[in-house]
C-alpha cells in the first residue's frame, strides 16, 4: 500500500490526530512523544514566534508515522522537534519495522517545506535511533547533508525483567539498608509517599514541583527548565494523569511537600522528567524515596524499562549500571547558508571532540593537564 504525507502547520490539525498519535507513542514506547505532553509544551514552552511544521505519514487513513517539528525563530532556519530543550529521548514516531521508509518520506517532505531548513536537529535522541542517518541518506539533492554531533550524554536505564524483589536483592546490602532506613525515618516523622491523582492534589503537586525545583536551582546559576514549566505540567496533567501516562510522586511531611518527581509513561517505558525537593530536609532523602517508589510501581505495572533521563549523576547510579546514551545531533542540508551554518556549529563540534579526546586520555595525563591549567 502506498504512503502519503501531510504537512501540518496549524495546531487544530495536529490536535485532530491526538488519538492515533497517542497509540503510536505507545507502540513505539516513547513517553516523550505523547501528544498530551508535546501539545502542552507547544502551548506553553515553545519559543515565541515558532512555526509548526509537523509531518504526518498515512497509509490509507491510518497514521503510521509522525515527525512533529517546528521552526525555531531566528535568522537561521532550524527545524526542531516538539519538546526540544525540555525533554530527553524525544523522537519522531514510526510503526516499528517501517522506520526507514517512513523516515525517508518525512525527510523528502521537509526538504520541500517552507521556510527551507538550514538545519534539522534531533536533540536528546537515543543514540541508536536510525532517524538522523536516514535523513542524511534520503535528503534529495546533488549533495548529501552534513551530519553533526554536538554532544553525547550517558542516560541510565533499568530493565524491569523479573520482579521488584529480585531487583532489590541484586542491589548492594548498603543500598537496601539506606533505603529501608530512609523509609522508616520518614514514617516515624509522620511523612508519606504517594501518587497525586485527584485534580486538587495534582494542581498542588505541579505547583510544588515548580516552587521546589526553582528554589533549589536559584543559587546554582538557574534551572535549564523554562519558568512556564508549571503551566506545561498543569496542562499535560489534565490529559495524562488519569491514564497513568504522567505520574506525580509526592513525598510529604506535615502536609508539606518535600519532593515532587514527575514521570511520563508509554508502551511499557517510564521516563523520569525531573524533580523538585526541599534541600533543608535532605536528611530524609526525599528524592531517592520518590525514585524508589516510582521504580517499585513500574515493576508492579509490568513495565519493560525505567529511563532515568540524561546524565549519569550519582543518585541514578545507585539504582542501575545500565546505560542507553542520548545525543544532540542533526543534519545541515546544502542551502545558501550551508557554509555559514557549519561555521556557527564549529565551536560545539570542537568542544565535543575535545571532550571525546579527554575521555580517552589516560587518567594520569588528565591530572597533569589539570595541574598545569591551575598554575595559569
Could you tell me what each predicted segment is?
Residues 41-43, 90-94, 102-105, 155-160, ...:
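Low-complexity, flexible helical/coil segments
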Residues 366-376:
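Short linear elements at protein peripheries
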Residues 3-79, 125-151, 155, 159-283:
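A conserved beta-strand-loop-helix scaffold within acyl/acetyltransferase catalytic domains
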Residues 51-52, 58-59, 71-151, 265-324, ...:
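Acyl-donor binding region in acyl/amide transferases
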Residues 107, 169-177, 343-349:
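Short intrinsically disordered coil segments
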